[in-house]
Amino acid sequence: MHTEGEGSKESLASREERILNFWKTQEIFQKSLKNREGRTLYSFYDGPPFATGLPHYGHLLAGTIKDVVGRFATMDGYYVPRRFGWDCHGVPVEYEVEKSLNLTTPGAIEDFGVAKFNEECRKIVFRYVDEWEHYIYRVGRWVDFSATWKTMDASFMESVWWVFRSLYDQGLVYEGVKVVPFSTKLGTPLSNFEAGQNYKEVDDPSVVIKFALHGDPGSLLVWTTTPWTLVSNMAVAVGPEITYVRVADKVSGEQWILGQGCLSRWFSDPDTYEVIESFPGTALIGKSYEPPFNFFEQKRAEGAYTILPGSFVEESEGTGVVHMAPAFGEADFFVCKEHHVPMVCPVDNHGCFTEEIPEYQGQYIKSCDKGIIKSLKNQGKVFYHGTVVHRYPFCWRTDTPLIYKTVNSWFISVEKIKDKMLQANKKIHWVPEHIKEGRFGKWLEGARDWAISRNRYWGTPIPVWKSKDGDILVIGSVEELEKLTGEKVSDLHCHFVDQLKIEKDGKSFHRVPYVFDCWFDSGAMPYAQNHYPFENQKETESGFPADFIAEGLDQTRGWFYTLTVISAALFDQPVFKNAIVNGIVLAEDGNKMSKRLNNYPSPMSIMNTYGADALRLYLLDSVVVKAEDLRFSDKGVESVLKQVLLPLTNVLSFFKTYTDLYGFDANNYDKEEISYSEIDRWILSNLYTVVGKVRESMSSYNLNTAVNPFVTFIDDLTNWYIRRCRRRFWESADTPDRRAAFATLYEVLTVFCRVIAPFIPFISEDIYQQIKTENSLESVHLCDFPYIDLAKVFPDLEQRMGDAREIVGLGHSLRKEHKLKVRQPLANFYVVGPKDRLDQLDSFKQLISEELNVKNIVFYKEAPSFVKTTVKPNFRSLGRRVGEKIKDIQKALASLSQAQIQQLLTQEYLSLNLGSEEIVLHMEDVLISWETDPGYVARSSSLFTVVLDCQLTEELVVEAISRELVNKINTMRRNQKLHVSDRIVLRMQTSEEVRKAFLHYADYICEETLTTQSEFADVLEGEEWDINGHPTVIAIEVAARPH
């Protein structure tokens, strides 16, 4: 009888809000912490977000991962503090203020006033903090908002100063001039890892310019995609080992010089030119040339405009001759510095030409490309002009093109500690594992010195005070600054400390005009969050390195990296032990999620529609937890709800329906007296196997392998155990079998809700609250995570049940393929497979028979005479690989014995001996089919072949009608929302065939539908049905209860 309700009618959003309110009012999170005080500390670092924007799926994903691990560790007995922190400084905040105050021109902030600007930044830092807290609260994540740390707090900033001073004391800090990524929109340098965060495909000019040689009739052909840098050209480089050619135009006689390997790239028609000579690159070194522009002709006397050797020069692109503007290229800078070539930088911090380039003064450099090319064309200096599509770095915050530019900056000597960083990385357990030697390891190998100073305002000021003659003082604490200035210091932002002058040794010292890269703030977070070393030394050191950290893949070049730099430098050890790296959540179309494009649903609407548990499980059970990108689909979340969570809710509803009906008391039964059936022992064995798998996966931080076992178990529970055991729960008498069924399902729910609690905390709490007893703890989240009960684990039973389910699955596939309803009984079902496996399935014959609705089951160790499995070559797969041998393979496959075919199915490969050659075939190389006698159909898996006898007798047809009637009547019971115990009166208007079937199977039909009275009518108002081709009208009503 299929009439129990489908779970609570309470909406998901209402249920989750109810549970959230329960956690809040009863302070369950606080109690979970208090219960573990004094236990082993489990520490993790939580990457601080900016509260100037709303959370997106990436934040919720990383937060969910952290929540799962934190909940599991707590349930596993650890004390897991979960302080939240906020990133308050830097470009994200400043940029928002600039937009709101319309401070768009160079110098606008200074004109507005730095102090006023910084205070405006302070005001908006927590613009969306309430929304952030609500999102985090709504997704079911537990964090402590009562003790948040903020990068703008004086205590945090003082610890950042301490970190900087410690690095300085180790000789790891220096001031220098280098070519670094530079945001002209922000007017500040960026770090190399920031520059790598936002590459785009762009169209840029591709031009080849003629540089006339002095004392030589030829011109060098020089390629560039940045024409604006040509005004700053100081040298060209050639490869000493490269062979160069002199080419003459057959008509004009004009001569050009370029790399021999580049010749075909620029000269496609050999009839238009001739190669006059070839020579090594060394023959060009030292020659002088005429630059494309003469803005800096005076620099020739200082060594400009000569040809230099460059080992970096290649012929894979361009011309083999490289234009060098040392102020705008890293390789250019070092080569020119090595050869004492002067440098010019006629570009200001906003990307505009200075007065040194009067023709373009005040104009943005990229907008001058066209004018520069036009000017060169007018001078006859352009050999080629086209466009090129290539990847180019953009500012990660303003989405404007970056340039590379020489700036004066403060650097951390990362290259000095590279080996320490690599050694630290070896001690970290990364998930997925390939991050260690792959993306993160390779980034560490290529680590460069870190430009940590920014020409900005709202940030932690770099604590360096400098005198006019260049002496410096590096301050490491507030106390030290107060002693040197004689002033009380309460705020460390620049508009306060820049007013402080230090007088020492007869000199005046003023602070340098830079703030820290905000990544330096967050890299110092493990220490600064606790005001270390000024306070909380024991707390900080006991939690270092962190047990766990989790962020997105982009943080391998961001926060993971900056944390590692500082930790390796200060302590020569990793800053965290275990790391989970997630991929990026993209829009469903594969593009980046964009508010402007409106190409994704809001997270809050998803949670209110499908529930936070569904969103959590959708993310956790996807490739995104393996550092792969996920195309977000609300249909995917809906699928998780319908296929996983609702069935689990229905199990609870089923259990509650019958325990309430029959009065099962969880406090009042003796487990020792329960006589468990085989299927009870199977589901309990399966349960504790899942416990072991989840524990093992969580211990190794593999969330994707932790989720799959319990998701699969839900299917095992709902679509096998409950379905197979319904009748046991229906028993009106208090039989040992019914008690065993109740006891089994109660144990499953009590253990399983603890297994799933870290992952889907709402539904686990709902289950727990509805089945807990007076002796239970207040919340499932105050319970211990279960351990595997080895006394209840039976691997052989799990294997046997797995085999039975595999056989049933094959049978159902055949029925579906050949359009044979399961309600249509069939006479015979044959199973072919290994004898040892089939021998163990004798006790499951009845189960298989009932599941497939067949009368008779026969096991064979070899295929019966009426079925033959055939194997043919898959020409599409094999054709290219084996060529003409395909005919020999076809013959060999045709001659395979049934035993050899079974070996292929079992091993999923087969070796064929073709004379002198052996060829290995895999499943994708062959096509499997089955030849059967008329009336039979067959299908195989790796272990079993099943054959279904499809021949229908009159008796089978009549029985099918009776089963169809039961199905339709019980559907009407559900639709009319009858109670599971309601008896009914049944009336029908139907054909003679259906009438006969009903009368023949009346006892069965009445028992299955709780029918106490039935009658037939010639005319009837009711619901119309098709009963296997017989139009039938059925009406039901609740029978009068006896007094």
Swiss-Prot record:
It is found in: Cytoplasm. Its EC number is 6.1.1.5. This is Isoleucine--tRNA ligase. ATP binds at residue 595. Coiled coil: none annotated. Signal peptide: none annotated. A motif ('KMSKS' region) lies at residues 592-596. Monomer. The gene is ileS. One of its GO terms (biological process) is isoleucyl-tRNA aminoacylation. One of its GO terms (cellular component) is cytoplasm. IleRS has two distinct active sites: one for aminoacylation and one for editing. The misactivated valine is translocated from the active site to the editing site, which sterically excludes the correctly activated isoleucine. The single editing site contains two valyl binding pockets, one specific for each substrate (Val-AMP or Val-tRNA(Ile)). Keywords: Aminoacyl-tRNA synthetase, ATP-binding, Cytoplasm, Ligase, Metal-binding, Nucleotide-binding, Protein biosynthesis, Zinc. A motif ('HIGH' region) lies at residues 49-59. InterPro entries: aa-tRNA-synth_I_CS, aa-tRNA-synth_Ia, Anticodon_Ile_ABEc, Ile-tRNA-ligase, Ile-tRNA-ligase_type2, M/V/L/I-tRNA-synth_anticd-bd, Rossmann-like_a/b/a_fold, tRNAsynth_Ia_anticodon-bd. Its cofactor is Zn(2+). Pfam families: Anticodon_1, DUF5915, tRNA-synt_1. One of its GO terms (molecular function) is ATP binding. It catalyses: tRNA(Ile) + L-isoleucine + ATP = L-isoleucyl-tRNA(Ile) + AMP + diphosphate. Belongs to the class-I aminoacyl-tRNA synthetase family. IleS type 2 subfamily. Catalyzes the attachment of isoleucine to tRNA(Ile). As IleRS can inadvertently accommodate and process structurally similar amino acids such as valine, to avoid such errors it has two additional distinct tRNA(Ile)-dependent editing activities. One activity is designated as 'pretransfer' editing and involves the hydrolysis of activated Val-AMP. The other activity is designated 'posttransfer' editing and involves deacylation of mischarged Val-tRNA(Ile).
